[in-house]
Amino acid sequence: MAKKSMIAKQKRTPKYNVQAYTRCERCGRPHSVLRKFKLCRICFRELAYKGQIPGVKKASW
């Protein structure tokens, strides 16, 4: 889990646009965030296995 101060800091609008970055909406992780779902890879995997993300299923070929 991310520190509360870092999550609050990220929600503010930055002085410069290049300073903006994505953060997981569920756990606050700043790295490996899928933009479409606003989740990190770990949270995405957990929710996908539980079937809580509509339209996502395990790949098989």
UniProtKB/Swiss-Prot annotation:
Protein residues bound to Zn(2+): C24, C27, C40, C43
An individual GO BP term: translation
Entries under PROSITE patterns matching the protein: RIBOSOMAL_S14
Alphabetized InterPro entries for the sequence: Ribosomal_uS14 (IPR001209), Ribosomal_uS14_bact (IPR023053), Ribosomal_uS14_CS (IPR018271), Ribosomal_uS14_sf (IPR043140)
One of the record's GO cellular component terms: small ribosomal subunit
Entry annotated with the keyword Ribonucleoprotein: yes
Gene Ontology MF, one: zinc ion binding
UniProt remark on cofactor binding: Binds 1 zinc ion per subunit.
Chain's role: Binds 16S rRNA, required for the assembly of 30S particles and may also be responsible for determining the conformation of the 16S rRNA at the A site.
Quaternary structure annotation from Swiss-Prot or TrEMBL: Part of the 30S ribosomal subunit. Contacts proteins S3 and S10.
Protein name: Small ribosomal subunit protein uS14B
Organism in which the protein naturally occurs: Shouchella clausii (strain KSM-K16) (Alkalihalobacillus clausii)
